[in-house]
A protein has these predicted regions:
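Histidine-centered, transition-metal-coordinating active-site segments
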Residues: 1-30, 42-199
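Short alpha-helical catalytic segment bearing the HExxH-like zincin motif
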Residues: 31-36
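Active-site rim/loop-helix segments in enzyme catalytic domains that contact anionic ligands
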Residues: 39
């Protein structure tokens, strides 16, 4: 997924530059690093861990901590990427490409989840959406001729929530996993040795 989002980010940078939006090479590299590392704080089972094993810390906060640790090892080479990730950089559209209503993360995971679940209604034209993006007053905007593509994106996202993310089987499996992890956490805190597969 991170590589897919990275690819879409590269496409978005190329498209925005072709419309006369000036993006320094250092900014392009930084926003690509930010999208590549945006989910580094996700553990296995995605958001389930946020509600069980790790309490009170979001995966975004963990991602930021890990990015800062990597940045220290790289002697500050991720400074700009971290600024963009934290929305502290003046060109707000760069952050919006990483984390916004039409970010490269969402464009990738919707297409990817649609493909792997077989729910064709979730399929979106990410290439078309990227081509319709532009920048106005340092914020991401959509050209008027792209409105239909955005409506399709929003509809597809809603359908994916109804048919996949909030499907009764998905919700039941998530609840079972949460119960299992909470029980394992409880037993481990009591000193009970738990079997874990070496795989």
């Amino acid at each position: 997924h991170s590589l897919g989002a990275f690819h879409l980010m590269s496409e978005a940078i190329t498209s925005l530059r072709s419309k006369g939006n000036f993006i320094f090479d250092s900014e392009a590299e930084a926003v690509q690093a930010a999208i590549l590392l945006h989910d580094i704080g996700h553990g296995p089972f995605s958001h389930v861990l946020e509600h069980t094993i790790v309490n009170g810390v979001s995966h975004e906060e963990i991602s930021l901590m890990l990015m800062e640790r990597i940045n220290k090892d790289l002697k500050g080479q991720l400074n700009l990427a971290i600024q963009i990730f934290k929305d502290e950089y003046p060109k707000k559209f760069l952050h919006q490409l990483v984390s916004g209503q039409l970010d490269m993360d969402r464009l990738d995971y919707l297409r990817r989840d649609c493909f792997y679940t077989g729910v064709s209604e979730g399929n979106i034209g990410s290439a078309r959406i990227i081509k319709m993006l532009d920048v106005k007053d340092d914020h991401l905007v959509v050209e008027s001729k792209g409105i239909y593509s955005i409506e399709n994106f929003l509809t597809s996202r809603r359908l994916m929530y109804w048919q996949v993310y909030l499907h009764k089987t998905s919700v039941a499996c998530e609840k079972m996993l949460i119960s299992t992890l909470l029980r394992a956490k409880e037993l481990a805190s009591q000193g009970v040795e738990l079997f874990a597969s070496p795989a």
